[in-house]
Amino acid sequence: MLTNTKPDEKIFQKNSTTGSYWITTFGCQMNKADSERMAGTLEKMGYTRADNELNADLVLYNTCTIRDNAEQKVYSFLGRQAKRKHKTPSLKLVVAGCLAQQEGESLLRRVPELDLVMGPQHVNNLENLLGKVDLGNQVAATEENFISEDITSARRESSICGWVNIIYGCNERCSYCVVPSVRGKEQSRYPNAIKSEIQKLAGDNFKEITLLGQNIDAYGRDLPGTTKEGRKENTLTDLLYYIHDVKGIRRIRFATSHPRYFSKRLIQACYELDKVCEHFHIPFQSGNDEILKQMSRGYTIKKYKNIIENIRSLMPDASITADAIVAFPGETEKQYQDTLKLITEIGFDQVNTAAYSPRPNTPAAVWSNQLSEEVKKARLQEINDLVEKTARSRNKRYINNIESVLIEGLNPKNSSQIMGRTRTNRLTFVEIPKNIDFNFSLGDEIDVRINETRPFSLTGELYL
């Protein structure tokens, strides 16, 4: 077994065996972007994408550990593949991502059929690690690693909308969150490297980019440079101005934001820069200040409301989405009701909700005031019902509006419709006109009159 080998330790020239591969991705947008990069590496090595995981010569699970149910799903998938490997010993079985980082070598002991366990900081090192596997080693790569600016060419899932990582890791210490221990410290990419990647995407006819970071407002804190006024000059705001002139890119998004660092200057930039879309994903997690303090979030509900007010004062129709956790340890009924009240007051377009799940090596996991599964289930159901009701009400404002929709493809459930997204990130289905000659290409922007709404999508017709 080789464990925690140095990233630059070259013990092979070229992988001797390739074949087909399959990647299953669990979790967040960061994982999706990492999976695209690993797929690009595998195809550069000579692998081809399998039609399903049961036919693949290499199966890779890019995992999430933010909640227990995400972990259990991975172990279920691994169990099936472990049985398959007994029948097909040549199968390569890889676990990447946050669960791999959290469990490390213990995952190799739990699932001895695994060939490679690699944390998210080793995405760029996949080829070298597989070379070590080819030499007959079982490999764990979970040591802290500097993430190279030499971003591997990704195999993009979309040909129109591209993920662009701008900062890795997280320096926050929220009491419930395992991310800092599995994603590592913040590492910002340099602006010129980011812009070069975006220019390449534009050259490949991409029309939209989403800048990604676990805590994207922290971008640049670890980079050198200050202005004459003493302000950091490499911030997310500065980056938006810097990349805005890339020709061919029509839309710019970013996620995920932290309320502690969401500034008026950033809001002003989003208002001034035409390509930056009017969609803001800003998790609030709880509507109660005492719970926020116990979560170590570093802001109050008053501050959060001020952020939303500042956004809507400049962009009244902006879409506001968020994350929320219910049944945090010790959360009283009154504190929980404060969260429901905030959802109603703000009028979110969408909220990703979860019941609290204890995570290893986090302070809240060992607190004695854990709530019962019954309470968790009831509160999660109630908040989900409210989120859907609020989203349904919010979407009604689009009726009869003319919205610009970026075409992403055909509706997979209805071939008579094309689908895309508005600038506010509303999924929109558009009936293909039958009475006129209508030709479209992926990446076209079309005007759509909205005539029907659902909680999380819109339907409309081409507006000529």
UniProtKB/Swiss-Prot annotation:
GO terms for biological process: tRNA methylthiolation. NCBIfam families: miaB-methiolase, MiaB/RimO family radical SAM methylthiotransferase. [4Fe-4S] cluster 1 binds at residues 28, 64, 98. Keywords: 4Fe-4S, Cytoplasm, Iron, Iron-sulfur, Metal-binding, S-adenosyl-L-methionine, Transferase, tRNA processing. HAMAP family: tRNA_metthiotr_MiaB (MF_01864). Its cofactor is [4Fe-4S] cluster. Belongs to the methylthiotransferase family. MiaB subfamily. Residues 19-135 form the MTTase N-terminal domain. GO terms for molecular function: 4 iron, 4 sulfur cluster binding; metal ion binding; methylthiotransferase activity. Its main location: cytoplasm. Catalyzes the methylthiolation of N6-(dimethylallyl)adenosine (i(6)A), leading to the formation of 2-methylthio-N6-(dimethylallyl)adenosine (ms(2)i(6)A) at position 37 in tRNAs that read codons beginning with uridine. It is found in: Cytoplasm. Residues 396-464 form the TRAM domain. Monomer. GO terms for cellular component: cytoplasm. Residues 156-394 form the Radical SAM core domain. Binds 2 [4Fe-4S] clusters. One cluster is coordinated with 3 cysteines and an exchangeable S-adenosyl-L-methionine. This is tRNA-2-methylthio-N(6)-dimethylallyladenosine synthase. It catalyses: N(6)-dimethylallyladenosine(37) in tRNA + (sulfur carrier)-SH + AH2 + 2 S-adenosyl-L-methionine = 2-methylsulfanyl-N(6)-dimethylallyladenosine(37) in tRNA + (sulfur carrier)-H + 5'-deoxyadenosine + L-methionine + A + S-adenosyl-L-homocysteine + 2 H(+). [4Fe-4S] cluster 2 binds at residues 170, 174, 177. Its EC number is 2.8.4.3. It comes from Prochlorococcus marinus (strain AS9601). It comes from the Bacteria. It is an enzyme of class 2 (transferase).
